[in-house]
């Protein structure tokens, strides 16, 4: 008698792959076909830059020194102190390293732990639309429901305002996840927009989960401002989430951090201690070296991304019925393709099938993203040059 698989829990029924993972499955299928054109990917948020040498050296030194035992699950003291130093230095925020900082295995787990600590079964979580789709599964795993906040394209950028937040609110809303710089659209929320968010959260007693992972990658006079620094009253109802993946090209290191009021951080610690535990000890040593060490590498990376951004905007300029939305931050640019009168997913598929370039269709990020394409410049050099050539050719062919 053949053994059958054990029954699976219903809590997984609402989970689905992220847009990037779903497209990767299509890419693998395409590449398995005989005679398929090799593809160039302008899809993923995976920097092609290397982790700076002094950070790598801190890790290897920790390994040589035998720093391979279980870590402090709250975060090793040097890392928590480096996080507190960084937040005061860069964001003007003071947190107690002992009670208000938590180290995590990447920012995504920090968001999951925050949701587990903040929302009950059936609670609603607000997400600005277009939505970074990796937020959706942690909300569902925590028993929550997603409520989108409609954004609008205004002045060449996506924006949200207090009216949109109010329109999305209901008595079941418990939290808002805010991402600035905003993946996928590249908007850096300004002081006025953040003040509106703060007023809304305070008026409606909504907790703020502030995802600031792209904070170091901003352009053209659009500096990152943490919502917690804009409105001091927001601090007691907010948790700041960040990681080292983008700022220091450390995606594979899987290390992030959270900062917030001590009771919330303690609750998040309980989630972490019973699941992922903390990042490896030697990884934490490298992270502390990154945050507390020289920051020249951050400036150099930002300058490199700025040059790539200009390359994207220049190469895709002047295509009839296509308009680029220049990003304020991050390493994604949105192409407004509403003038082509085709669904964004159809355009994406044509670009891959007929022109050998992979991007993400805006509709993958919610109804607010329909009519756009997300173009990544996390990779540069020949990959970016060839990809942009193919993208220009493919978009022109859709006319």
Model-derived features: positions:
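PLP-dependent enzyme catalytic core of the Aspartate aminotransferase-like
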Residues: 166-167, 341-343, 350-359, 365-399
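Structural signature of PLP-dependent enzymes
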Residues: 268-273, 291-313, 344
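Structural motif of enzymes handling amino- and sulfur-group chemistry
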Residues: 262, 279-295, 300-301
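Conserved glycine-rich beta-strand-loop-beta hairpin in the small C-terminal domain of fold type I
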Residues: 288, 304-313, 324-337
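N-terminal small-domain helix-loop-helix segment of the aminotransferase-like
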Residues: 2-106, 113, 290-293, 398-399
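Conserved core of the PLP fold type I
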Residues: 67-199, 216-217, 224-232, 390
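Active-site PLP attachment segment
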Residues: 230-267, 279
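Helix C-cap/helix->beta junction micro-motif
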Residues: 30, 34, 142, 203-204, ...
